[in-house]
């Protein structure tokens, strides 16, 4: 199905600035050449330009690429990490935060139970 991002096994964001004039082939070249990753993996790759008001998402669907584009409404900005030359894995929760304009790290958010440590019971 076109644009079903839930089919992605992982999400990676390309930190820093990306030239938003790039299309599928240019974004694939960044993934392959700069980060030595496979753009045809079941991974959602996210890119952001200097203005931080639009992002592109690239996903391989098995028979072709899907390129998604989101532009924030008036004065909206994405909180994008600017570490140059880095690609970063993010969770689906972080993706939700990012896509709505929040920062990737939300210190006051509840952590999933798997990150809180093991619970012990006493007999």
Identify the residue ranges that each predicted region occupies.
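Polybasic/polar functional segments that serve as interface/processing modules
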Residues: 1-123
């Amino acid at each position: 199905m076109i644009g079903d991002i839930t089919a992605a096994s992982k999400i990676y964001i390309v930190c820093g600035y990306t030239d938003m004039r790039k299309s599928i082939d240019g974004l694939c070249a960044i993934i392959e050449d700069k980060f030595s990753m496979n753009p045809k993996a079941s991974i959602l790759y996210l890119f952001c330009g200097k203005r931080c008001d639009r992002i592109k998402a690239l996903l391989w669907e098995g028979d072709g690429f899907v390129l998604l584009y989101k532009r924030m409404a008036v004065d909206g900005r994405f909180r994008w990490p600017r570490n140059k030359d880095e690609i970063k894995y993010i969770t689906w929760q972080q993706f939700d935060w990012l896509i709505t304009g929040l920062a990737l790290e939300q210190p006051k958010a509840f952590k999933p139970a798997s990150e809180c440590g093991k619970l012990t019971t006493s007999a």
